[in-house]
From Swiss-Prot:
Family of this protein: Belongs to the DNA polymerase delta subunit 4 family.
Subunit relationships: Component of the tetrameric DNA polymerase delta complex (Pol-delta4), which consists of POLD1/p125, POLD2/p50, POLD3/p66/p68 and POLD4/p12, with POLD1 bearing DNA polymerase and 3' to 5' proofreading exonuclease activities. Within this complex, directly interacts with POLD1 and POLD2. Directly interacts with PCNA, as do POLD1 and POLD3; this interaction stimulates Pol-delta4 polymerase activity. As POLD1 and POLD2, directly interacts with WRNIP1; this interaction stimulates DNA polymerase delta-mediated DNA synthesis, independently of the presence of PCNA.
Subcellular location: Nucleus
Chief site of localization: nucleus
Outcome after substituting residue 25 to R: No effect on ubiquitination. Loss of ubiquitination
Effect of residue 4 to Q: No effect on PCNA binding, nor on degradation after UV irradiation. No effect on PCNA binding, but normal degradation after UV irradiation
Name of protein: DNA polymerase delta subunit 4
Substitution effect: residue 8 to A: Strongly increased stability following UV irradiation
Amino acid sequence: MGRKRLITDSYPVVKRREGPAGHSKGELAPELGEEPQPRDEEEAELELLRQFDLAWQYGPCTGITRLQRWCRAKQMGLEPPPEVWQVLKTHPGDPRFQCSLWHLYPL
């Protein structure tokens, strides 16, 4: 009986070259629960508004502005975050802040 064949007998071994710094892999993924920090205050405010858009406990957000949705949730006693109202009042004419995450999608 012959010797047991290995997979490397059929396929050549290919060694990969490492990158210029000696590392062949990229950055490690962030730890669970660790969220990337926003670049600046405006980006942090937009992220707060995106999270408000994704929170369904305040009702649907299609077809109305974020301020209208916030006021409707307040009237219904759903206690929307006051930080959202403050951000919306500081940027009254900016559609990036006033329109919801879904405003570009047709109904």
